[in-house]
Amino acid sequence: MKVTLPEFERAGVMVVGDVMLDRYWYGPTSRISPEAPVPVVKVNTIEERPGGAANVAMNIASLGANARLVGLTGIDDAARALSKSLADVNVKCDFVSVPTHPTITKLRVLSRNQQLIRLDFEEGFEGVDPQPMHERINQALSSIGALVLSDYAKGALASVQQMIQLARKAGVPVLIDPKGTDFERYRGATLLTPNLSEFEAVVGKCKTEEEIVERGMKLIADYELSALLVTRSEQGMSLLQPGKAPLHMPTQAQEVYDVTGAGDTVIGVLAATLAAGNSLEEACFFANAAAGVVVGKLGTSTVSPIELENAVRGRADTGFGVMTEEELKLAVAAARKRGEKVVMTNGVFDILHAGHVFYLANARKLGDRLIVAVNSDASTKRLKGDSRPVNPLEQRMIVLGALEAVDWVVSFEEDTPQRLIAGILPDLLVKGGDYKPEEIAGSKEVWANGGEVLVLNFEDGCSTTNIIKKIQQDKKG
């Protein structure tokens, strides 16, 4: 199944925060200065790129979404360079000019793909009247699908709590890339996106994934957040939401050259995807793929729709992820040549919960590769009734494909996956619940081929039906 990109062109996002100009001086170096033990760089190329909150807006615009940017600048060449660069990529700028301060500028000197030094030109904007920014936010709220607050602790978000309240009253989700350890400032936000270091600076060192989840859920409760996304570098990302199983997504980066601005890309793609009408789980899936692209570039960078589509398709192209039936058969054949044991299971997986995650993790431990076959929407409706599925097939497959335990995800249209299983013939067929092995669809075919069939227990107390009933009861209450 081909994963469809969000309709970014219908998404409107406002970014408010610390804007800055990133300057890059490039050149060769072949000698050490006689004045001090430092390399001499002969500068032959100079580049200027929007940074900080401006880079977030650039990332949103590069996807084809409508991006508006509000921030504080000086009245200087750097501000003019920022405005021109952003206008060239269709970012609508509405800066508040502060004549007493310079525009924040960061100068990096690079040679042979290595950053040698960074020079910062800045004065904090603390104490600047926030009212002009509040007015700009209020004027835009009726026409945007998400508000991003990009905090680099330079003073533009000194009144962040008022900004959150403005958006909440308008029903607009607020996404924040936090800075520092005072998360009380961000109380009531829809989503925070700290990296692991920022997260641990607040909750303490986490030795295990379980500790990340436990402390993250407490942080959500303490600060009345709707969700938390912890970006974990080479370990991917972890999405935490109240009442839902944690979603751990492995990194998609092939090579890492520069992590500059990667957090900007993540929150930019998250916001654009949500504003386009997609779910938070889908937004994290696309943001994770985009992060894998941008860290493979040098310097502050953005991701285009073509790059994002290629990254999303990348797992299937390399033999993993969401697949068609024919692609899966080729992937399984390649796995068998490598001597790998293939495990297969199936289900609706409508609202993914902890029971599903534990079950799939246990199934994966029984072999080297795990296939999850998913009922199509029509198949689910016939099986579960007209009110199901809650989540359409594409969303269900995307979420399953993001799980570390799952190697391949494929769909089937029939009431049972018997035909599909007969075509794949896994080494081990597993099913959760209280079935007898001979009752499981495809068991006869697997046995006839010399394979095994096994029934695994589900985690007690976890049920999609019960979750739906509770949601319905809460709505009535």
Curated annotation (Swiss-Prot):
What is the protein name for this chain? Bifunctional protein HldE
* Top-level taxonomic group: Bacteria
Q: Which pathway does the record list?
A: Nucleotide-sugar biosynthesis; ADP-L-glycero-beta-D-manno-heptose biosynthesis; ADP-L-glycero-beta-D-manno-heptose from D-glycero-beta-D-manno-heptose 7-phosphate: step 1/4; Nucleotide-sugar biosynthesis; ADP-L-glycero-beta-D-manno-heptose biosynthesis; ADP-L-glycero-beta-D-manno-heptose from D-glycero-beta-D-manno-heptose 7-phosphate: step 3/4; Bacterial outer membrane biogenesis; LPS core biosynthesis
List every position bearing N6-acetyllysine. Answer: 179
| Annotated GO MF terms | ATP binding; heptose 7-phosphate kinase activity; heptose-1-phosphate adenylyltransferase activity; phosphotransferase activity, alcohol group as acceptor
HAMAP family for the chain: HldE
Per UniProt, what is the name of the gene that codes for the protein in this document?
hldE
Tell me the Gene Ontology biological-process terms attached to this UniProt entry: ADP-L-glycero-beta-D-manno-heptose biosynthetic process; lipopolysaccharide core region biosynthetic process
Identify the Pfam families for this entry.
Answer: CTP_transf_like, PfkB
Query: Region (Ribokinase) spans which residues?
Result: 1-318
InterPro entries linked to this entry: Bifunc_HldE, Carboh/pur_kinase_PfkB_CS, Cyt_trans-like, PfkB_dom, RfaE_dom_I, RfaE_dom_II, Ribokinase-like, Rossmann-like_a/b/a_fold
